Each structure stands twice: as structure tokens, then as C-alpha cells.
């Protein structure tokens, strides 16, 4: 009998004991974890390759977090074959035994929770609170999905007639290719890996090239937790060479992808083509980003509105698909809200996230830095720069939290996903107009409405077309089991990660009817 699910609590770093524990974890990671080399893992065997992926600290380009062997198409083929072979036994493993692997993995991660979070500080430049939340979410995914599988194994009730027994059960699907992002490098990577595993599928994991070390560490945890060889296969590599090969392979049954719209739609298109020897249609589970809006009504709490915009825009330097990169504010409170957001933003510290007092660290790499700085130049032409706007990539990839005012709703800064610390303000004259602007992008992931008007809340519930809608809070920070996460429109397939329907996406429903 398992205990009821409850999300992993966040660490309060205002408590000195917790601060010291995390400082010790950072020291451990610096002295013992950094600079290691990690092989491919295929069918339980280790493969070292000549070509490597080098993971660096985005806050300090001179610091190597680790090197990871880089897979070729030959390795990808071996991984698919190993996963297909392991599927023939893993699919029949008792669901409670599969769930037990996740519970053991959770215990191992919890024992080194601060060390894993400290690794995220190094590999992704996450501030302490963001890193701690990422690790907590990874724990939550394992805890939640393990419990969900135990329930799902019972099947669903259907009607039976006299002399007839009918069952509706779920069966595993097959080989799952998992392509996670670099931003939630532990949480999403872990969640999208263990969901197919616990449902009886096998996995080929191709981690993000910008953050492969945490994935290598997690594969070690799964192996130490009793996961049989071949159930998860670790093949970091380029998207063009390895990613496409895995997506196209006739033995691939499911592709789970989190990342950009461009790559996601390409995967969706490639997966739809039936390859020679393929005996099934591939399932694609995709989350492809957002252009998310915080709507501020005229009847609102000004401080709450400002804090919500700030948190939504600049948490983890805006490198979240859920980030509130658009603030659509009623003209009656526009100036006051904008002024307060600027004040909050300019009071926060930006720098290397090794220190507890740093609110915002670097962006992930040079390509991201260049892209964001290009968008800042576009913003200077489209709107009014009121805070930030400078970048410094001399040591790490640092960009000031940047605020633009007076944007046209159809401006590029209001339409295109930037994935950086940039928020654009647009003024509206009514709640009708606010909803119209909120819905005017091709995305539909998250949104928030700050208002005291109950009628407007009820309207937004119906008319604000996003997968995750929040009222009187920020539009980021979904909790597994509490806020199932996934978007509408071009934000993806609305596969709600951390929700009651998610595991079923990895399985096939089977009807069994027996006469007696």
C-alpha cells in the first residue's frame, strides 16, 4: 500500500542550516563531480567514443562540467535494437515491480538532492531556488507516475452481460525515443524517461547536447535502482545525425519531444511517414514552447500584478516555455504596474549563481546569447527600452533582465518566442481587448490573469485559450499532480505532463471479452 502522493517540498534557503548544506553540496560537486567523462550506455554496456560533447558552465565558460561520448548512427541502431529486445521481457514485468524501480530511484535522488541541484547550478546556470525546484520536480514525476501506474494497471471498468466478462486494460506500446530539453534538464528529462519505463516500454534517451551530464547521472541512478539492461539506452548525439535516425526508425513506436516549435513540427512530420518494415503508426508526444501572457485588469492588486509579471518573465532568465514574455496591461494601471516591475527588476542581483543571493544567472550558451541580444535590438526599434538591454559574454553568457514598453500587439517581440530575459508590455483599453491580444499568437501554453473581477475571471476561463491558465499569480511553476502541464495550438499536443492522462499516452487500450 503506497502513501498518497504529495509534491516534494522546496528548500527554504532563508534557513542557515539549509544554506550551509547547499554550500557543502556545491563544494562536493566542484571537487568530485566536475570534469568527469561519461560513456554511452547501450544494453547495459559502456561505449567510449572519440568524439565528445563537452558540457560547460554557462556562468563560466572556462569550467568544464563534464564530457560525454557522442553517439553515431551505428550506436543509435544498436540502442534501438537493444530497446526492442528488452521490450519483449520488460513489457510483461509486473507493474508494481516497474513502479518499485522508480521508488528506489526517488530514494537515491533524495539522499543526494542538494548535490543534484548543485550540478544544475553548474550545468545550466540555475540559481539555487530554480535548481532546487528542478530536482524537486524530477522527484515528483517519479513519485507521481509510479503511483499512477499502480492504479492504471487495474484497468478501467466497462459493462458486462450475463455469461460474459469484459475487461478494459492498458498494454505497453514499444520502443520510445526521448528527446528532452536543456532548460528543465533534470525534471523534464527524468519525467519523459520514466513515464515510458513505468508503463512497460523501453527507452532510447538522446539528451540535450547543452546539458547531457545530468542525464548521464540519472541513467546511473536508474541502473543502481534495478532497471534491467536495455530498458534505458543513453545515446547523446546531434539532432541531424542521431535524432533524425531515431525518429525515422521503423522500430520506434513513440517519440517524446520537448523543445522548439521548429524542431517539434519537423519531428511530427517525419514520424508521420511510414517507413519500410514499420508495423504501426508512431505516437508523438510534443511540447513546443509558448509566447505566454500575463493579463492585468484595471481592477487588480498592483503589487501582485508587478510581482507576477516579474516572476513570470525572469525566473531562470526567461528560459522557460511557460515564461510570461508578454504583459498586457489595462491603460488605467499601465504606468503604475510598469514602474513597479522596473523597480523590482532593478533591485535583483544578476551574476554567477554559486551565491544564494543571485536571483538570475546566465543564459545557456553563445547561440542563445546572440539570439536574445538580436531580439533586444529589434525591441529597440519596435518599442521603448525602459530597463536592462545590456549583455556581457566575456566570462559567461549574461544578459540583463530587459523590459520594453509600448509594444504593438503584432510586433515581433509580442509574437516570437525569445527564450530569454525579455518582457514586452502592451497597453489595452478594455478586458475584451486584453483577451483578444492574449489569444493573438500561434501558441497556447500558459497564461495568467490578475484581476479582482469575478465576471472577468469566468470569461477568461472560457475565452483565454491556453493549456495552463492561472489567476492572480505567475504563469510559471506548474506542480506535478497539481497543475498538469501542456499547451494548445502550436505549443504542442496538449499531452498533460504530470497529469492523470499522461501515462495512457504511452500505452494501448485493449478490450478483452470472455464468455463463460
UniProtKB/Swiss-Prot annotation:
Disulfide feature: none
Keywords attached to this entry: NAD, Oxidoreductase
Pfam families recorded: Aldedh
Pathway membership: Amino-acid degradation; L-proline degradation into L-glutamate; L-glutamate from L-proline: step 2/2
GO function term, MF aspect, one: 1-pyrroline-5-carboxylate dehydrogenase activity
EC category name: oxidoreductase
Active-site residues per Swiss-Prot or TrEMBL entry: 287, 321
Record GO biological process: glutamate biosynthetic process; proline catabolic process to glutamate
Catalytic activity from the UniProt record: L-glutamate 5-semialdehyde + NAD(+) + H2O = L-glutamate + NADH + 2 H(+)
Enzyme Commission number, as recorded: 1.2.1.88
Cleavable signal peptide: none
Cellular component GO terms held in the UniProt record: cytoplasmic side of plasma membrane
Coiled coil regions, renumbered to chain: none
UniProt cross-references to PROSITE patterns, sorted A to Z: ALDEHYDE_DEHYDR_CYS (PS00070), ALDEHYDE_DEHYDR_GLU (PS00687)
Family, similarity comment: Belongs to the aldehyde dehydrogenase family. RocA subfamily.
Protein name stated in the entry: 1-pyrroline-5-carboxylate dehydrogenase
Species this chain originates from: Bacillus licheniformis (strain ATCC 14580 / DSM 13 / JCM 2505 / CCUG 7422 / NBRC 12200 / NCIMB 9375 / NCTC 10341 / NRRL NRS-1264 / Gibson 46)
